Design a protein with these regions (language model features):
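Short linear regulatory motifs enriched in tryptophan with gly/pro/ser
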Residues: 1-148
Length: 148
């Protein structure tokens, strides 16, 4: 397999606030979430999701924080069944980067904290065929600080 180079941009200031992150394809979306939050120094104490569309809340597929699945109310379980979503499809901890079948130029959205809505989007810049698929996430370049 391979590793992937993503440019992660803050939606509110994409030219001045971004990070380049390399991550192995066998790594989970939860691993990517941790790399993003570490690189922007925003913590880990809120719910989050990755989406496949540019419109965050209207994404056809949402890969959510594992905490989204803890102690779900019954109506949420019912909604997931009706919508055709199963935990395996939507729990980000169980989805690898490889499983997304991304091509160079494809985009993902990432939303952290459902109340404050820290919005980021990711662009796949390069597929690194010679890098191992188990590669730990690495921040290779960046610009700007959120709290600076």
């Amino acid at each position: 397999m391979a590793s992937y180079l993503f440019r992660v941009k803050a939606d509110w200031d994409p030219r001045n606030l971004w990070r380049d992150i390399v991550i192995g394809g066998a790594r989970s979306l939860e691993d990517l979430h941790r790399a993003i939050n570490t690189s922007f120094e925003i913590g880990f104490d809120h719910l989050w999701f990755f989406g496949t569309n540019r419109d965050f809340w209207r994404s056809r597929k949402m890969y959510k924080s594992p905490k989204d699945f803890e102690n779900l109310p019954k109506w949420m379980e019912y909604w997931d069944r009706l919508s055709g979503r199963s935990e395996a499809e939507t729990n980000a901890a169980g989805v690898s980067i490889d499983e997304l079948n991304l091509k160079v130029g494809d985009r993902l959205c990432y939303l952290f904290d459902y109340a404050d809505e820290w919005r980021f989007y990711l662009i796949l810049k390069k597929i690194l065929e010679d890098e191992p698929s188990q590669k730990e996430p690495v921040i290779v370049k960046g610009k700007g600080e959120i709290f600076g």
